Structure formats: structure tokens, C-alpha cells
């Protein structure tokens, strides 16, 4: 196990991730994974990489249906809470990688990579997608959910300061063109629910999202 991987048991509930797992994030994650299950036929032997996994809301929805889930993130607090959830639920078929994707190495290729609400944090998308292709099995899938370009949530609270934010959302059609230029052979855009945040003055801020399912060569 590399020094980037979690190998500690967590018996006390960490608070950072607990705050993240609210009814909306849980519901949106389930909507995403239900749609993936409808669109992609994964075998019991499948391996999934949950990129920017946070507290594991996407990957944990597959944990009983595939052989292994790899959770990647750079947030200690989120991953501590994910570790706590796995420990308390007796989950064994997973790996937690605490570090940047460029440093991730695996001797096994993966069937599906999920990137839920994380791409707008990544500066060099081309390098990231090259890494994804390196990790995917032939004809493997990448599933992205993110915010549409200039979503209102980029103007409120946390997304104004303590986040790294190289992209203010994406135009899904343009992103599909880029994804194909980076080596994926098929892309499809799907509709998903909007996300609602509380604005700086307590108002409701609705931001549209999209899903892209891409297939590697």
C-alpha cells in the first residue's frame, strides 16, 4: 500500500464529510448512478474508479454490484468520512487513494471511471483525460457530471474563495468535442437534475448540470 493510500481505521465519525452528505447530494448521486446502471452494462467482475470521490456517494452505490471500487480524492476530511462509512458498514472491496490522479498507479485496468462534479476543479483536462485512457480497459467508459457554463453557484460563498476553480462550468457540446479530440471514440450527453444552493443572502440558487458518457477506444 502506497503512502498515499488510507490504511487507518476510523471509529469516530469525522464531521467534514458528514456535512457534505446531505439529502440533496445523496439524491443527486443516486440519480447519477441509476442512470449509469441503465446506460452501461457492468459485470460482477468490473472495477470502478471514482475520481474526486469526496465521501464516496457515487462509488458506494456500486459497491455490492462490482468486484472493486477505487476512490480517489485530495481531501483528507472527505476521505476520512468515507473510511468511516466503509469501516462501519463492513465494506472490504475498495481502495482509497489520497493524492492527485497523475500519481495514481494500478496494475489492473478499470471498466468505468466516474467524475462527479469535479472537472471544474481541474486545470489541465487534456492530461487528466490521457491518464483516464491509460487506466481504462479497451472500450471502457467515462461518466462525467458537472455544471453548465457560468452556473450561478460560481458566484456564491465557498465557490468564490476556498475552492480551486479553473473552469466556471462547461458547454457540454464543446466538452464532447474536446473529449473526442483527446482520444475517446464516442460521447453522449444526458439530462440530469439541477443542483440547488443557498446564496449568500439565503436565497435559492439553481444551477443546471449535465452528464456525459464517453467510451474509450
Predicted regions located by residue number:
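Conserved S-adenosyl-L-methionine
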Residues: 184-195
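A conserved beta-strand element that flanks and buttresses the S-adenosyl-L-methionine
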Residues: 114
